[in-house]
Regions:
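Peripheral, non-AAA+ core regions of ATP-driven protein-machinery
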Residues: 1-218, 222-228, 330, 470-471, ...
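Short loop/turn elements that form and flank the Walker-type P-loop nucleotide-binding site
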Residues: 59-62, 99-100, 132, 150, ...
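Residues immediately C-terminal
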Residues: 111, 302-303, 309-310
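P-loop NTPase nucleotide-binding/switch module
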Residues: 171-209, 213, 241-294
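Walker A/P-loop
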Residues: 219-258, 324
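Walker B catalytic acidic pair
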Residues: 299, 305-307, 317
Length: 507
């Protein structure tokens, strides 16, 4: 008798149905697993054997072959333990084939038969839904994550014995009640807010514009000027994730984190990889293809502190995802695409010593050193950054004499940003979400710009020798500024402010 149990495995950003087939023949007792599995799957032989025996169930005595089909697809992970165990129980006649049909199973077995959490439970659930399979069995710790996929029943399984009794209809496991799930937000409580920052009004304004329209921003200035604090304050200005975004972000993090993510990700990601991180860890890839930091920052923020300290190859690799909002990784066994729609927030020093343009201290760098340092940021990458802001140190006397306003600037910013979001939502319906999402081909059709503002922009673009990409970025940023001010059309002051942030003066 051949048994068949359905499972799933991640494949790129999506998943693939896997049939766990089992067969037993006469011969010396053995368990062989075939179908391009890795070492973790090979080791499952001993885990499964112990789990079945310690669950007071009989392990068959015979030559057992388990096939993970399709065989041509590489497979890894310990989540095949549970379907392998069920396939063996079907071979032994302890379970019937009908007991395990029309369901997807995934879970790692401990030696005592209990289930441990797995990676990518949400992808298992999504694959089941796409295949019109209504029941999914995953470890209890993963049930809330899998329950993000609606329209199917998610059964939280504590151990192999309880699942066996459920399948035999002796002791029923109830599917998870989605109404009882409470998503806990961490709210970036340790991050600074705008009110914590003294001075830097232009930089604060640029941060507000960046958040309101999802525009990439670069802050340049000497050490101690507050660049990093400004960048981190952006965390507390971001809107909450929508339900669809929670699913996307949780899928990516379930694939890419080194620790197993059991619960849904409900906060917007804020990723800040160190400048020594490898290209594969930031862009994605590796021998086992995984999403990199740019994909883990999807729907959130990628913060690159000291931008020019990153290798040139890493910086140049950002160009395509900044434009296309996804990254494609090519390997011998296929091409894998991951979403990478992030807000880039970067900081940099204007020169190697960091003091170029500082009003109090003198820069000790030669002109050649400054030029070579700034050349690390290529023109094409800089062209993809919407806002560049020079951040100077706040004089000490202003710090001591600073009087905090009784009105919260943070609350004002949040109110204006939410109004801008509402305007964009009404304008674009479901086509786009933010002003920065508009493709250049649609800018003229969608954005309303007055004739005087259009003439002003055309003259400025000619004088500043703006590229085509920069020209359209100025319009998009102008549209965001107009939205923040509640203006139906883009006017000259909006364009003038936007052009200030296109003055590429990183020193």
């Amino acid at each position: 008798m051949i048994s068949r149990v359905i499972s799933a495995t991640p494949y790129g950003f999506n998943g693939q149905i896997i049939e766990v087939e089992g067969d037993m023949s006469k011969g010396l007792p053995s368990l062989q697993i075939v179908g391009m599995g890795n070492k973790a799957i090979d080791e499952s032989r001993d885990r499964v054997r112990s789990a079945i025996k310690n669950s007071s169930l009989d392990f068959p005595k015979g030559k057992i072959i388990i096939n993970l089909a399709p065989a041509e697809l590489p497979k890894d992970g310990s989540h095949f333990d549970l379907p392998i165990a069920l396939s063996i129980l079907c071979i032994n006649g302890v379970l019937n084939q009908n007991d395990v049909s029309n369901a997807v199973f995934a879970g790692e077995l401990a030696l005592d038969g209990s289930l441990r959490p797995i990676r990518s439970a949400i992808i298992t659930a999504e694959v089941a839904k796409n295949q019109k399979i209504k029941s999914v069995y995953v470890p209890a710790q993963n049930a809330e994550q899998a329950a993000l996929v609606t329209g199917i029943d998610i059964f939280p399984v504590e151990n192999l014995k309880s699942l066996f009794l459920h399948l035999k209809k002796e002791k029923i496991i109830k599917p998870i009640d989605r109404s009882s799930i409470k998503n806990v937000s961490h709210d970036h409580k340790n991050a600074p807010i705008i009110d914590d920052i003294y001075g830097q009004e232009q930089a604060k304004r640029a941060i507000q514009i960046a958040v309101a329209g999802r525009h990439n921003i670069l802050l340049s200035g000497p050490p101690g000027s507050g660049k990093t604090m400004l960048a981190k304050s952006l965390k507390n200005l971001l809107p909450a994730l929508s339900e669809d975004e929670i699913v996307e972000v949780t899928k990516l993090h379930s694939l890419g984190e080194h620790t197993i993510i059991s619960n849904p990700i409900v906060d917007r990601p804020f990723r800040s990889p160190h400048h020594t991180a490898s290209r594969a860890s930031i862009i994605g890839g590796g021998s086992k293809v995984q999403p990199g930091e740019i994909s883990l920052a999807h729907r959130g923020v990628l913060f690159l502190d000291e931008l020019l300290e990153y290798p040139r190859t890493v910086l140049e690799s950002l160009r395509q995802p900044l434009e296309d909002h996804e990254i494609t990784v090519s390997r011998a066994n296929g091409k894998f695409s991951f979403p990478a729609n992030f807000l880039l927030v970067a900081t940099m020093n204007p020169c190697p010593c960091g003091l170029l343009g500082d009003p109090e201290k003198t820069c000790v760098c030669s002109q050649n050193q400054i030029l070579n340092y700034q050349k690390r940021l290529s023109g094409p990458l800089l062209d993809r950054i919407d806002l560049t802001v020079s951040v100077s140190r706040v004089p000490h006397e202003k710090l001591l004499n600073n009087k905090m306003s009784t009105k919260s600037q943070q609350d004002t910013f949040l109110s204006e940003i939410h109004k801008a979001y509402s305007i964009q939502r009404d304008r674009y319906k479901c086509s786009y979400k933010y002003n920065n999402d508009i493709p250049s081909s649609d800018v003229d059709k969608i954005t309303s710009i007055s004739e005087s503002a259009k003439t002003f922009l055309t003259n400025a673009a000619r004088k500043l020798d703006l590229s085509t990409r920069s020209y359209f970025k100025v319009i998009k940023v102008s549209r965001t500024i107009a939205d923040l001010e509640g203006s139906a059309s883009i006017e000259i002051p909006h364009v003038a402010e936007s052009l200030q942030y296109r003055q590429i003066n990183i020193g």
